[in-house]
Amino acid sequence: MKVGAVIVAAGRGVRAGGGIPKQWRALHKGTVAQASIRAFTGHADIRDVVLVLHPDDIDTDLWPREPGLIVASGGASRSASVLAGLRMLNGKTDAVLIHDAARPCVTTRVIDDVISALRTAQAAAPAVAVVDALWTGENGQVTGTADRTGLYRAQTPQGFHLDAIIKAHRQFPEGAADDVEVARRAGLDVVIVPGDEDNLKITLPGDFARAEAILRARDGH
């Protein structure tokens, strides 16, 4: 099975601070996006890696010119950006892993598990079971509790057979929270593989320090 990856780095989110999109903020030995890219370009089972960029970023020095990296121009929505990346792999791979560039601490084990699941399933994605108590609330007040049984925190990379996820994105181009939702709308069954607590999505300013500590620990310093 030939496997490719699409790394989505076309967002403009600045909630994490710094005045520039979070994927281009400095982290460890490069940037947030660079750490994500290297997790896939350095993986033995991944054949082609596509980096989806915002059109304004393509002609800048923000993104790393990694050997063999394929660049795609993102669209007006996340779904359009993903589809642009998927099209770059059409005819090259059998399966694809779609990853948020803002998850720079993804592990080889998580990538391995998603690929392994795709050998027998059309779709697979990592997740971590919810263990905290869940409340509902309104106007700063607790209004109730929610049963956490069967609830998971979704992560990436989310993996699919390439033809199936391209068809799904064409059928359902808007409004999905992630690619698993797109796949399920199209009738695909999605296998859950174990996620990793370290596979955080950088969203808020404090997330950078945590990600830095994780990556430094892996390097042994």
From Swiss-Prot:
Signal sequence interval, chain numbering: none
Catalytic activity of the protein: 2-C-methyl-D-erythritol 4-phosphate + CTP + H(+) = 4-CDP-2-C-methyl-D-erythritol + diphosphate
Pathway(s): Isoprenoid biosynthesis; isopentenyl diphosphate biosynthesis via DXP pathway; isopentenyl diphosphate from 1-deoxy-D-xylulose 5-phosphate: step 2/6
SUPFAM superfamilies found in the cross-reference section: Nucleotide-diphospho-sugar transferases
InterPro entries xref list: IspD, IspD/TarI, IspD/TarI_cytidylyltransf_bact, ISPD_synthase_CS, Nucleotide-diphossugar_trans
Site (described: Positions MEP for the nucleophilic attack): R148, K201
Catalytic EC class: transferase
BP-aspect Gene Ontology terms: isopentenyl diphosphate biosynthetic process, methylerythritol 4-phosphate pathway
Molecular function GO terms recorded: 2-C-methyl-D-erythritol 4-phosphate cytidylyltransferase activity
Function: Catalyzes the formation of 4-diphosphocytidyl-2-C-methyl-D-erythritol from CTP and 2-C-methyl-D-erythritol 4-phosphate (MEP).
Name of the protein in its database record: 2-C-methyl-D-erythritol 4-phosphate cytidylyltransferase
Organism: Roseobacter denitrificans (strain ATCC 33942 / OCh 114)
